[in-house]
Curated annotation (Swiss-Prot):
Substrate binds at K51, Y108, R112, S116, R175, L176, H177. Catalyzes the oxidation of either pyridoxine 5'-phosphate (PNP) or pyridoxamine 5'-phosphate (PMP) into pyridoxal 5'-phosphate (PLP). Pathway: Cofactor metabolism; pyridoxal 5'-phosphate salvage; pyridoxal 5'-phosphate from pyridoxamine 5'-phosphate: step 1/1; Cofactor metabolism; pyridoxal 5'-phosphate salvage; pyridoxal 5'-phosphate from pyridoxine 5'-phosphate: step 1/1. Its cofactor is FMN. Gene3D superfamilies: Electron Transport, Fmn-binding Protein, Chain A (2.30.110.10). Binds 1 FMN per subunit. FMN binds at residues 46-51, 61-62, 67-68, 90, 125-126, 169, 179. This is Pyridoxine/pyridoxamine 5'-phosphate oxidase.
Length: 196
């Protein structure tokens, strides 16, 4: 891969690679590892689902009572990684994080399937529960409560991950991989090549 192969905007470059991963029938191309840290710097990571790009950032949605949400509120910086084995490509991002507005979260919530909307009410994410039956009971309760329209819970919504650094990696023979890094400087993106 050559520098001239890259677009000047890393978000647009990401979209190209993401679409390529979809065309190659990658299993869960929208899965990304999100790394956060609490106010003391203790890190944690987990897979989340990427839900699009808006206003210069990657969108994710979660329960605001979850560990990730607490950490993003305490320390609004994050790192994230997409890896697509079928195309042998990886994209890394780092940057600041902001909560979406209630209106943005509700607009996305309305696009979710009925079952996913119910699940948002059911899961007390990251909290200890007694057993699986507890979840099933809650699921039945909320299906009964919301038989038609499911409103967006106040404790559920999105975050925008706004990168100031992004890295695009392509695996090559003999471990001579291609790595290009986009760095945001004075509101402009600078692109440099990194050693593998």
């Amino acid at each position: 891969m050559f520098r001239l192969d890259l677009l000047s905007d890393p978000l647009e470059q990401f979209k190209l690679w993401y679409d390529e991963a979809i065309r190659h029938e990658t299993l869960h191309p929208d899965a990304m590892v999100l790394a956060t840290a609490d106010s003391k710097g203790k890190p944690s990571a987990r897979n989340v689902l990427y839900k699009g790009i808006s206003k210069g950032g990657f969108l994710i949605f979660t329960n605001y009572h979850s560990r990730k949400a607490h950490e993003l509120d305490e320390n609004p910086q994050a790192a994230w990684v997409f890896y697509w084995p079928k195309t042998y490509k990886q994209v890394r991002g780092e940057g600041r994080v902001e909560r979406l507005t209630q209106e943005e979260s509700e607009a996305y919530f309305e696009t979710r399937s009925y079952e996913s909307q119910i699940a948002a009410w059911v899961s007390e994410q990251s909290q200890e529960i007694p057993d699986r039956e507890y979840l099933i009971t809650r699921y039945k309760k909320y299906r009964e409560k919301f038989q038609d329209d499911v409103r967006c819970p106040e404790f559920w919504g999105g975050f925008r991950l706004i990168p100031d650094r992004m890295e695009f990696w392509v695996g090559q023979e003999h471990r001579l991989h291609d790595r290009f890094c986009y760095l945001k400087e004075n509101q402009e993106w600078k692109i440099i090549r990194l050693a593998p």
